[in-house]
Amino acid sequence: DLTKKVTTEIEEQSVKRSIEVIRNRIDEFGVTEPEIVSQGKDRIVVQLPGVKDIERAKELIGKTAKLEFKMVNSDVSMQQINIWLDKAKKEGVEFNKGERFSKYVNAVNENLKNDLPVGNVLAFERKVNAKGEVTQLTPYLLSATANLTGDDLEDARVQFDQQQNQPQVGMNFKSRGAKIFGDITAENVGKLMAIVLDGNVYSAPRINGKIPNGRASITLGGQSYANQLKEAKDLALVLRAGALPVQLDFL
């Protein structure tokens, strides 16, 4: 059966590609002698000797979706966004512990599709504790279409501000991305651009001026130095490592 053969080959390639991406992420996570092997047709066993923060490791390994850069709609206040969310909640749409967060986000946008401005969607930045439980949700109203994607990004890395030696994330865009990024930053000085992964807002830095050469930096303010450095490392890793070809479910 040709269809079965093609499907099997696609599954095998997806597993192999996932192993490559996971290995890349784990290597950058700083684990010595990790073991990453396929088991059966659709399972990958990952062993990380010495890693104590399992939830953080899961979070970094399991980022699955396409990386997108989307403008935040600054014309709508947070007060208005919360009014919309309260409306959805009264109509039975709220996040229940244990369910997929993407299910909640999809339900919110479906419920509010006649209320939100045309061409906009709601997305959230999540803060989680050591147990992986959501402790804080920050809503953002975003452009429904991405201005840039991870395909436009050449590289991302941790670097340090020359004046105050604060950790930040440096990004280099490819030629196409550099042109688009230059135009976007010129037109949106003072506004926020969200970095979106798997439909979730990972960060929403402010555009401080036109960036014409495809090289940008993301500053991480309002935190301790240790937290800034951790966030810079995590964000650079997410930007650099790319997307997994399949959805991962942790067993």
Per-range role (PLM):
Residues 1-206, 216:
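Non-transmembrane, solvent-exposed regions of membrane trafficking/translocation machinery
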Residues 209:
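Conserved actuator
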Residues 212-251:
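Extended, hydrophilic extramembrane loops/domains of integral membrane proteins
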